Amino acid sequence: MKLSRLIFILILLHSLSFGVAMAQHVPANNNHDEERACAHQWLLEHGLNTKSLSLSLTYEDIGFLVFEDSRNHCFCVVANKEMWPLLYGPVLAYSTEVALYMNSKPSQQYNGVMKPFRDQLAALKMSAAGPDTATAIYTPKNKEVLPMLGSTKWNQYRPYNMFAPTKNGNRVLIGCVPTAVAMTMRYHQWPERGEDCCYYMMDSKTMATMDFSKCTPLWKSYKDIYFPEDTLDEGAQNLSKLMVSIGLSVDASFSDTGTSASMKNVKPTLCNHFGYSGHIAFHDMRRHNLTEEQMEAILYKELDEGRPCIVSNAGHAFVCDGYSDGFLHYNFGWSGHYNGYYRLMTGRYNKLISGEPPILVKYFISGIEPQQPDGGVSREITLKKAGTLQDMLTDTEKETITKLTLKGPLNGSDIKLLRKMAGANDGFSLDGWRGGALTELNLREAKIKDDKTAYYSKPAKGVWTSYENNKPRKYDFSKSLTKSDWISFKNGPGSRMQGMQIVRTDDDKYFEHYFCQRDMIGKFMFANCSSLKNLVLPITTEKVDDHAFQDCTSLTSIVLPPSTESIGRDPFRGCFSLEEVLLPRNLNVKDGTICEGCSPILRSAKRY
């Protein structure tokens, strides 16, 4: 082994030993024979050699044990025996690709990956649910889908970051999001060349441009793994440039100690610059009100259809690229370290220990695949009656139309469908819908009508304050309101709302519903329409309300019609591709609030 390669391995293992211990290293005299036998048998059944396998109990965590054999590059995580009756199975995770190389202090990576197991086992102890008699949301089509990324073992360090910017005299880390995106693109071997350009800030004062037409990935030249001395390798150099361009496009915050980026920015990067399908969708478990079972169902369906998913636990982005008999396979982008199979859920519990679901995957991106050359579909439709758009389109058209011109009256059901076609991910569905591909929407000759059909709904959050006899009264929807508080809210501020309504369900949950108002682009009307690149508003538009286009991450330009009289708060927050906003000359608005969270080139809105 070359000295530099040995040093690379030692540095990697040292970096993985960072962190705060959450349990205790195993004393030599501990005895867990049944758990060890379980791990041994499990690994034998999954391909390890009978004669050479020799497992060591290297770590005793809270509720489970880590067994590994570094010579055979494997590990197996087994729950303590007393927990087995509460679990889907005693094995929580395993790998036949790599050992964990545990020492007396578990690493930050270890704690990030294993903490969900601690939390789930604690939840099961506190309140285990009975047997699951419900019909499965989705049944996987296969017993297994082999890891689609194969033996890819990339990371964020040298040589992957050799063309990255420098800070404090050091090359910044590539970041987990660009690494996960690059690994997924390698699987698809797409594109041959990038397209268009993006703007980014080199520092607080200097803006630069990235020309993606000069980005030509050498897919056939990329290796499964590179080492620090591979800086002269043509494939390594090309890959580093690709990863840097991805990082700049997703607006990564580069640092020499850790680089971060928003998962929401992945779709516009792939669609706008690398020729990927608009069917890509970002899922946020809490924001989209998804259950653990629903998250798992979508992941399995994507894998069955041959699409790896980029997933995240809120601290690290990685790739889910396969499954086997109840376990999901992850490639963590840590030079192969920790790659293996993990249960998303270990058993059924009735309530949570903390405020968030105790699973490893809390966010993920589905539908990642190249746009087909003939995938664009254009339609022009004139509606004679509001609410009939659904009947004017076939199911295939709803999913595949990329350019749409609409004329005539529109109501809430029409807007709701347009949102779905334009990439808004408003809820869980396994009905075959692949996600919206609509990139260009022309509503110039359309007219928005008053309506009581909600075009958008979301869980109610935050605190509402009303004043009674000059005294404030607060209603906190992050908590359960008392019956008297709810009646007071309904008869007070709730009765005075325009264009929205807050409702209470039988299981004591609260939701905000938003409705169409005549000639108004209402609150959140096109929010999260992540496929939209160009949008022409109705010429009769009189008002644009708060957050109307929030998180339209692919939107590049927009013109507010001359009839527009007012505009609400933060209409374009999170539209990070937005480069141009044209406003009527007499529209009264503070330009500073218009451009927050948009492309760096958009310093202020232009007047006409």
Model regions and ranges:
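Active-site-adjacent structural segments surrounding the nucleophilic cysteine of cysteine proteases
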Residues: 87-259
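Structural signature of tandem-repeat unit edges
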Residues: 378-384, 402-410, 436-452, 468-520, ...
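Boundary at the C-terminal end of the N-terminal hydrophobic targeting segment
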Residues: 19-23
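Exposed beta-strand-loop-beta-strand "reactive/processing" segments of non-cytosolic proteins
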Residues: 47-82
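Bacterial N-terminal signal peptides
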Residues: 7-17
